[in-house]
């Protein structure tokens, strides 16, 4: 396990280093790039030194430090993605297991139909439908922002729920409820696609495990169905799914850009799209580096967690030697 972890960490370092060339190219080879006047080597050394010290330069649009802007928008996107990812796991894992143990029955067919429908709906269309019905027509939920305009929440961590909870305002409970109400529509919109994929992965894994002899032997010993599902099916069906969850998080980070634009969510995706519109290449380079690094780190962590849950995974390399 130690060798497997070290191998993944080395892969992480190499991949992040290669990613720096992508970010640097946006600051050097594009028209009106900030580093275009210097030689290639000197420009890369200067840019890489700034990257190490978390200095991405200043925006060509408003003159503000890009690092300060990232500190404001990055927590908003992470809060949205974490909540949506948690919702996808809470719903997708049990529903996928139900579909797996009831395969070819009406429960399985119904779950597959709903999952296929959710997977096929474009994110922007789903966001517009939820906005139309839940906000504009019924007036249940707000359509944009993170808080009501009545509340002024001091940014401490950048996470709306945590900042509202840490606030010493007498209206703290109302601030928390306002933050929750503003998150419901974006979280639902963002969680639909990964939820359907988790359902599909969990269904396939459950079917494979449910046909194993040790599951049938547990049933012949008189164990209850709940005990069999908890001890044998879930314990063995979940580890193969864990390494693939990193890809779902990466996909969700991409979908967050569209979600943030529709709901005017002040996050990294909306900030990056605005930078692309305004051709702010220094900001684009910083956004690409942050998003790419996050995707790589999450995938490596999911691989390591998958190997910890399934010891056979990190032995595959030795079996191929």
Curated annotation (Swiss-Prot):
Gene Ontology molecular functions: dipeptide transmembrane transporter activity; putrescine transmembrane transporter activity
Membrane topology: Multi-pass membrane protein
Role description: Part of a putrescine export transport system, does not play a role in resistance to antimicrobial peptides.
Pfam families in alphabetical order: BPD_transp_1 (PF00528)
Bilayer-crossing regions: 9-29, 81-101, 113-133, 175-195, 249-269, 281-301
Name of the encoding gene: sapB
GO cellular component: ATP-binding cassette (ABC) transporter complex, substrate-binding subunit-containing; membrane; plasma membrane
Annotated SUPFAM superfamilies: MetI-like (SSF161098)
Protein name: Putrescine export system permease protein SapB
Family per record: Belongs to the binding-protein-dependent transport system permease family. OppBC subfamily.
Periplasmic compartment segments: 30-80, 134-174, 270-280
Disulphide linkage map: none
Keyword Iron-sulfur (UniProt): no
GO biological process: peptide transport; putrescine transport
Signal peptide location: none
Recorded phenotype for the gene knockout or disruption: Single mutation, decreased extracellular putrescine, in an sapBCDF operon deletion no change in resistance to antimicrobial peptide LL-37. Operon deletion has no effect on growth, but if the putrescine importer PuuP is also deleted then growth is slower.
PANTHER family with a match to the protein in the record: DIPEPTIDE TRANSPORT SYSTEM PERMEASE PROTEIN DPPB-RELATED, PUTRESCINE EXPORT SYSTEM PERMEASE PROTEIN SAPB
Ranges per topology, Cytoplasmic: 1-8, 102-112, 196-248, 302-321
Organism expressing this protein natively: Escherichia coli (strain K12)
Residues annotated as domain ABC transmembrane type-1: 74-302
InterPro entries: MetI-like, MetI-like_sf
Localization: Cell inner membrane
Keywords: Cell inner membrane, Cell membrane, Membrane, Transmembrane, Transmembrane helix, Transport
NCBIfam families, alphabetized: PRK15110.1 (NF011690)
